[in-house]
Regions:
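Active-site-proximal region of nucleotide-activated glycan assembly enzymes
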Residues: 108-156
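Short amphipathic alpha-helix
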Residues: 10-11, 18-29, 42
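An aromatic- and histidine-rich active-site surface loop
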Residues: 86-105
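Extreme N-terminal starter segment of soluble prokaryotic enzymes
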Residues: 3-10
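Conserved nucleotide-sugar phosphate-binding/catalytic loop shared by glycosyltransferases and other
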Residues: 13-15, 33-68, 142-143, 153
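Residues at the starts of beta-strands that form the adenosine-phosphate
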Residues: 8, 34-37, 53, 109, ...
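An amphipathic, basic-hydrophobic alpha-helix
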Residues: 63-86
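Histidine-centered beta-alpha loop that forms part of the nucleotide-sugar donor binding/catalytic region
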Residues: 14, 92, 113-117
Length: 156
């Protein structure tokens, strides 16, 4: 009898508050499923990732166009190497290429959790990711006016 494979879950976020919100959102999921983290290399993320499967991406900066190219190449590479079935992300911009290429190349399911900092207006990342998300969550009811197809999950 064949052993059923657990879904491969990519937990993708920027450092700082986005990482903290994703930690709150996923709780114990990483212990129960085949998960890996995808984020930026900072002192705090390196400490948190010490005992976790992870990938560090280059942060893209609008003023330095080459960083977007590097981030896209890294995103394609890691999507093809890791083959995530699901991406759970809180953004920010560094995760957009990974979501885009995973969706287009593999048909990966995407769960996006909008930042609690977005109370009445969105930042750029949710606007970009909304069209690729299979489940789009907002933390404030006022954000349902901006994203009417979203689900309000409450503040994490």
């Amino acid at each position: 009898m064949m052993k059923k494979m657990k879904p491969r879950i990519c937990l993708a976020c920027s450092a700082g508050g986005h990482l903290r919100e994703l930690q709150l959102a996923v709780g114990t999921i990483p212990q129960d499923y085949d998960c890996y983290w995808l984020t930026l290399r900072t002192t705090s993320t390196m400490a948190f990732m010490k005992d976790k499967e992870h990938v560090f991406l280059t942060n893209f900066q609008p003023a330095k166009k080459w960083t977007l190219i590097v981030n896209c190449i890294q995103a394609i590479f890691w999507v093809l190497v890791k083959h995530p079935n699901v991406i759970i992300t809180t953004g920010a911009g560094v995760t957009v290429p990974t979501v885009f290429f995973a969706k287009k190349l593999l048909g990966t399911k995407v769960i996006f959790i909008n930042s609690a900092a977005d109370v009445t207006r969105p930042s750029r990342t949710p606007v970009w990711i909304e069209k690729y998300a299979d489940l789009f969550l907002v933390q404030w009811e006022d954000m349902l006016k901006v994203f009417p197809k979203a689900t309000c999950c409450g503040v994490l």
